[in-house]
């Protein structure tokens, strides 16, 4: 029997153990009392407490083999580490910690997702193009589906550069089945966010149906935004000299300003340049000929 490094124990302790074992009366096996585990070595009886008959029997025993076996047993018992009891009934702190960790793992919080009292998950987002108005996205069976709906709405409204999503951007774009183009997702026009109100019609559907319905609602919004961006790009290119057959708003305004300047020049040309013309159409005023200071004094003295 080998339990590691064997250390020799005191012979007096072994004698006390043997004396305690032999000194116990064995008249009736049912009346044998099991020694308590909590008893220490000091509490064991010594050789002085052993009766005379038992002491003579103890001296006749050969302790050569028993000494080594008891030493190995005692060393093995002493080398066993004290293991912590993991029973949840006796150690409730461990069970409570593990339970709280499991609960915290299950209840992960997502951006834009709220749990309803009846177990469903609601998703909503604030539209930054309309002064932070709350936009309802629907109610879903799981928190992941609601978080995905929020991510898709965030990408469509704020764009891929400014959107803060719950999942990775590649996962969201793959779910939307769109090309990863940052300019395509920018929704700066306030009118383009109005179709999001119709997402209330999604209602209490399954996750796939809700996401599909939301995609159908917002696809029209993206097409409208593309048309608006195309018009603005065309108008911008025309203002830079790439003019087409149609007149842009900037050109119309510039032409009106040039017309106003020409009208002012014509009014200036209509002013009288000779002394014979005393009437001017400018602002409906009369202009008199300069007759000199003498004529003015004569005219005033006559009154």
Curated annotation (Swiss-Prot):
Quaternary data: Interacts with MED25.
Segments passing through the bilayer: none
Function recorded in the entry: Probably acts as a transcriptional activator. Binds to the GCC-box pathogenesis-related promoter element. May be involved in the regulation of gene expression by stress factors and by components of stress signal transduction pathways.
GO MF terms held by the record: DNA-binding transcription factor activity; transcription cis-regulatory region binding
Protein name: Ethylene-responsive transcription factor ERF091
Keyword DNA-binding: yes
PROSITE patterns (alphabetical): AP2_ERF
UniProt DNA-binding residue ranges: 109-168
Top-level division of the source organism's lineage: Eukaryota
Pfam families: AP2
GO CC list: nucleus
Coiled coil feature spans: none
Cellular location(s): Nucleus
UniProtKB keywords: Activator, DNA-binding, Ethylene signaling pathway, Nucleus, Transcription, Transcription regulation
GO biological process annotation, one example: ethylene-activated signaling pathway
Similarity-based family: Belongs to the AP2/ERF transcription factor family. ERF subfamily.
Gene (name only): ERF091
């Amino acid at each position: 029997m080998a339990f590691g490094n064997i250390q020799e124990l005191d012979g007096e302790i072994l004698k006390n153990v043997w004396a305690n074992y032999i000194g116990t009366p064995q008249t009736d096996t049912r009346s044998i009392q099991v020694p308590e585990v909590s008893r220490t070595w000091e509490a064991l009886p010594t050789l002085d407490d052993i009766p005379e008959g038992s002491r003579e029997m103890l001296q006749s025993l050969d302790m050569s083999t028993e000494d080594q076996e008891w030493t190995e047993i005692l060393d093995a018992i002493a080398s066993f580490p004290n293991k912590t009891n993991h029973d949840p009934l006796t150690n409730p702190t461990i069970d409570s910690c593990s339970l709280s960790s499991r609960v915290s793992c299950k209840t992960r919080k997502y951006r834009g997702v709220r749990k309803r009292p009846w177990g469903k998950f609601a998703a909503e987002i604030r539209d930054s193009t309309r002064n932070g108005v709350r936009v309802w996205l629907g109610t879903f069976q799981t928190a992941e589906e609601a978080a995905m709906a929020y991510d898709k709405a965030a990408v469509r409204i704020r764009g891929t550069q400014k959107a803060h999503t719950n999942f990775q951007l590649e996962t969201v774009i793959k779910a939307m089945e769109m090309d990863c183009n940052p300019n395509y997702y920018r929704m700066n026009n306030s009118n383009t966010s109005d179709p999001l109100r119709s997402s209330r019609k999604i209602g209490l559907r399954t996750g796939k149906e809700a996401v599909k319905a939301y995609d159908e609602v917002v696809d029209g919004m993206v097409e409208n935004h593309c048309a608006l961006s195309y018009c603005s790009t065309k108008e911008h290119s025309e203002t830079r000299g790439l003019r087409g057959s149609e007149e842009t708003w900037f050109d119309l305004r510039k032409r009106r300003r040039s017309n106003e300047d020409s009208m002012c020049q014509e009014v200036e040309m209509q002013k009288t340049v000779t002394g014979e013309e005393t009437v001017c159409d400018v602002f409906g005023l009369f202009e008199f000929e300069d007759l000199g200071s003498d004529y003015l004094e004569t005219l005033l003295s006559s009154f």
